[in-house]
């Protein structure tokens, strides 16, 4: 059968090669994934999550169809989860085979093809009952290829040959060795007389002579069997092992070597696609687990409509933070969020723990999950992909030895401008919190002016309420250089309580303080009243 290529993530070879060459990969670093906690949400062992992202609309839509099949067919997820450890075992065997001696290598080769056949039969038996329910071209093609493979004469012949050789090898229980002695009864040379399918048993010379039933028993020894390694040094064990394996190699080498060639040819032509699929299968199964966990809390999920890259659309209804939802297992407060001509970048202010960081991350989550091909945490979403997600979040590991904390923050912010484009997303959370509000507001206004001129989308979540008051001046300054408009958002508070509702309005820092002070009795009228009572 001809070599077959299939992918659960890419619709054709060209798209796969573009991804491998980094031509359609958005710049999303592992640091960004850690900041958004997506490495926690989708934990991969055999690949890197940052390599799974794409900017290609066709690729995203191709993946969406795969995930729809996975979500609509529970048994499909179960099937792929069963397949994962088998493929992992094959990879481990390949590694061990390359590190082992000839005998072990041949045995690993037999086990490898057994695992391949197990995997293919598992797929065929699992996909056949659900074939009429599959809609994605990836999974339909996978079923058709596996079905064709299992029906081929070559596959049937391979099974027969495997069973014959497996029986030969796996039924070996003992080896009869002939040893020549010198005049002083010291071993001089040795060779294998026979390979047996029965084990030797301990016995005694007298029993062998007197008992008729032992006389014709070739597998009862005339002395007790001794453990192979008893009384031997490590060096002696190695020498004996090596000699024994060399003898076995001579017995099996002709059939084993010819078999290994058959196995290699079969694997390369028909089964190696499973190993190539292994990281993709791990990714889609782990990602589907995330989606199922979010569904259990009855939070909305929707496959986004993907628009042209150049449209720079982001219109989302009912957005929420999926990481918080997964950790709490509760129904989340939802918000509506959009980037538009009046606000491609936002300054988000509000009370501490009022939801600023939560919504900032949520916007990053929607872009990231969309560009993995997954449904996003929202009830409606229309999105243009980004060519990178850049974050600057608080960290407890600032390298402040050379620059000081403010210097380090500025250095990290400056790095963003090395790669950011008009099609990027920038998320800044409490940046410049290491200095006073006057200095921080000045530096922040310079950064916002630069990001406006770049034309990227993003959010600056900050405690600097006065920064929101500077937005009109920043927009006025950058409009003559073609800058995109910046707008303001406010994390809501009602009667001193955080509402977690994000509103598009100008900030009023005093209102937060006034509401909270009133709640805890820290107003001038109440203070005077308490002072009078104490007199």
Describe the role of every protein-language-model region:
Residues 1-186:
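Conserved amphipathic alpha-helical "coupling/scaffold" segments
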Residues 276-324:
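Charged, amphipathic alpha-helical linker segments immediately N-terminal to NTP-binding catalytic cores
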Residues 215-230, 245, 345-359:
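A short, charged
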Residues 171-241:
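Structured, charged N-terminal subsegments at the starts of enzyme catalytic cores
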Residues 309-535:
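ATPase nucleotide-binding head domains, primarily ABC-like/P-loop NTPase cores
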Residues 229-265, 271:
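Extended, charged coiled-coil "arm/hinge" scaffolds of SMC/Rad50-like chromosome-maintenance ATPases
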Residues 108, 269, 273-276, 405-408:
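Alpha-helical initiation/capping and key positions within long helical/coiled-coil segments
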């Amino acid at each position: 059968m001809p070599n077959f290529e299939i992918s659960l993530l890419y619709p054709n070879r060209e798209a796969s090669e573009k991804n491998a060459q980094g031509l359609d990969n958005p710049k999303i670093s592992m640091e960004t994934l850690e900041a958004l906690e997506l490495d926690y949400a989708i934990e991969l062992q055999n690949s890197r999550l940052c390599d799974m992202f794409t900017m290609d609309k066709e690729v995203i839509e191709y993946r969406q169809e795969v995930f729809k099949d996975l979500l609509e067919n529970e048994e499909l997820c179960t099937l792929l989860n069963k397949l994962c450890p088998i493929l992992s075992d094959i990879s481990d065997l390949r590694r061990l085979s390359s590190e082992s001696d000839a005998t072990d290598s041949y045995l690993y080769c037999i086990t490898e093809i057994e695992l391949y056949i197990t995997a293919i039969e598992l797929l065929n038996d699992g996909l056949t009952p659900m074939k009429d329910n599959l809609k994605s071209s990836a999974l339909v093609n996978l079923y058709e290829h596996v079905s064709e493979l299992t029906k081929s004469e070559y596959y049937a012949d391979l099974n027969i040959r495997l069973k014959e050789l497996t029986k030969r090898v796996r039924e070996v229980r003992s080896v009869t060795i002939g040893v020549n002695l010198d005049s002083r009864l010291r071993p001089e040379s040795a060779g294998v007389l026979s390979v047996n399918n029965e084990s030797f048993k301990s016995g005694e010379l007298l029993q062998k002579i007197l008992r008729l039933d032992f006389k014709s028993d070739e597998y009862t020894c005339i002395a007790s069997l001794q453990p192979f390694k008893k009384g031997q040094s490590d060096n002696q064990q190695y020498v004996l092992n090596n000699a024994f394996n060399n003898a076995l190699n001579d017995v099996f080498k002709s059939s084993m070597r010819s078999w290994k060639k058959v196995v290699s040819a079969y694997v390369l032509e028909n089964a190696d696609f499973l190993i190539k699929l292994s990281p993709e299968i791990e990714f889609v199964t782990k990602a589907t687990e995330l989606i199922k966990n979010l569904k259990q809390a009855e939070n909305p999920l929707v496959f986004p409509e993907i628009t042209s890259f150049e449209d720079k659309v982001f219109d989302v209804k009912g957005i929420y933070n999926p990481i918080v939802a997964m950790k709490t297992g509760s129904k989340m407060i939802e918000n509506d969020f959009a980037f538009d001509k009046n606000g491609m970048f936002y300054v988000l202010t509000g009370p501490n723990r009022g939801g600023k960081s939560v919504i900032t991350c949520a916007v990053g989550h929607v872009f990231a999950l969309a560009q993995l091909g997954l449904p996003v945490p929202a009830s409606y979403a229309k999105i243009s992909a980004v060519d990178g997600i850049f974050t600057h979040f608080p960290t407890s590991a600032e390298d402040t030895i050379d620059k000081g904390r403010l210097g380090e923050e500025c250095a990290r912010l400056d790095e963003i401008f090395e790669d950011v484009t008009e099609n990027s997303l920038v998320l800044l959370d409490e940046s410049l919190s290491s200095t006073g509000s006057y200095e921080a507001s000045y530096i922040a206004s310079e950064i916002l002016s630069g990001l406006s001129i770049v034309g990227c989308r993003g959010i600056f979540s900050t405690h600097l309420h006065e920064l929101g008051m500077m937005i009109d001046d920043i927009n006025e300054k950058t409009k003559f250089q073609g800058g995109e408009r910046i707008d303001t958002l406010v994390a809501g508070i009602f009667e001193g309580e955080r509402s977690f509702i994000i509103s598009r309005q100008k900030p009023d820092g005093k209102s937060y303080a006034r509401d909270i002070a009133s709640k805890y009795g820290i107003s001038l009228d109440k203070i005077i009243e308490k002072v009078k009572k104490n007199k």
